[in-house]
């Protein structure tokens, strides 16, 4: 049995007395900042709203939606029994424990509320967020690897298997599934969405990019979970599937529905923007 020893990476990026900043927190910060920059860049190329000013205002909504939704999703989907017994711990977001599907629900709620409040289609905003989202996912998965958490299933004969230092990993070589997910959910999905967003006919058809993100992420997550060790407090569910796979199936179905309806939805052309559509 071989395996690559986990590199000696300190999960703490900066420590100044009582102030401790982890790479995981910096990954979130970098993801939000990149998302804001990239979305405003896209918004300038698409007529109508949301405008770059809208996106600057929406940034706060996005941060709140992702953090609250991500934490609530982790509490409800992954460790509900524990938090029923220790309810105050649900507020300790700094102690770790975030759910992508919860964060997605939170930002979708923020998109719907912001679009409704400002009088434009939430799909127009969702399309921009969808293109930038995979970069945040990539950074988050890299931070998971740096933290030595969410490791993969045992793979004693895999040449690139990693031996994670956490005693709960059992000292056996495992798939570096965080890196697989960083590639699939992050790099590959971003490349596809950025290419589609470069096509005026695609980016002006509201809903196409949102639907593609949901389908693409759902498939990538279902595949990535094949190599990822399930959360110990949940394990495998019915028929050997994981919670992450179950939560990803509705994403794919909703994404397909959005893609089917997108050709019949509004088009963000200069003429449509001038007409106030």
UniProtKB/Swiss-Prot annotation:
Membrane association type: Multi-pass membrane protein
Transmembrane segments: 16-36, 58-78, 93-113, 119-139, 182-202, 207-227, 239-259
EC number per UniProt: 2.5.1.145
Any single biological process term in GO: lipoprotein biosynthetic process
Pathway(s) of this molecule: Protein modification; lipoprotein biosynthesis (diacylglyceryl transfer)
GO cellular component terms given for this protein: plasma membrane
Location(s) in or outside the cell: Cell inner membrane
Top-rank taxon, per record: Bacteria
Pfam families given in the database record: LGT
Coiled-coil spans in chain: none
UniProt-listed PANTHER family: PHOSPHATIDYLGLYCEROL--PROLIPOPROTEIN DIACYLGLYCERYL TRANSFERASE (PTHR30589:SF0), PROLIPOPROTEIN DIACYLGLYCERYL TRANSFERASE (PTHR30589)
Family from the record: Belongs to the Lgt family.
Protein name: Phosphatidylglycerol--prolipoprotein diacylglyceryl transferase
Lineage: Bacteria, Pseudomonadati, Pseudomonadota, Alphaproteobacteria, Rhodospirillales
Gene responsible for this protein: lgt
């Amino acid at each position: 049995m071989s395996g690559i020893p986990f590199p000696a990476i300190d999960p703490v990026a900066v420590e100044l007395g009582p102030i401790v900043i982890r790479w995981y927190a910096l990954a979130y910060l970098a993801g939000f900042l990149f998302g804001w920059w990239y979305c405003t860049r896209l918004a300038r190329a698409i007529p109508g709203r949301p405008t770059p000013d809208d996106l600057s205002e929406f940034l706060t909504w996005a941060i709140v939606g992702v953090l609250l939704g991500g934490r609530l999703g982790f509490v409800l989907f992954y460790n509900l029994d524990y938090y029923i017994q220790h309810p105050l711990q649900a507020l300790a977001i700094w102690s770790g424990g975030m759910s992508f599907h919860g964060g997605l629900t939170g930002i979708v709620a923020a998109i719907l509320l912001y679009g409704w409040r400002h009088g434009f289609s939430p799909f127009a905003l969702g399309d921009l967020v969808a293109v930038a989202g995979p970069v945040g996912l990539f950074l988050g998965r890299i931070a998971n690897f740096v933290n030595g958490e969410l490791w993969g299933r045992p793979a004693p004969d895999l040449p690139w298997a990693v031996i994670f230092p956490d005693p709960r990993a059992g000292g056996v070589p495992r798939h570096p599934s965080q890196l697989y997910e960083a590639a699939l959910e992050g790099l590959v999905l971003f490349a596809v969405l950025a290419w589609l967003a470069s096509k005026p006919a695609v980016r002006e058809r509201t809903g196409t990019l949102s639907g593609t993100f949901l389908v693409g992420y759902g498939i990538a997550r279902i595949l990535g979970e094949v190599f990822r060790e399930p959360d110990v407090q949940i394990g495998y569910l019915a028929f050997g599937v994981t919670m992450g796979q179950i939560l990803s199936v509705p994403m794919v179905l909703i994404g397909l529905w959005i893609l089917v309806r997108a050709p019949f939805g509004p088009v963000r052309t200069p003429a449509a923007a001038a007409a106030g559509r």
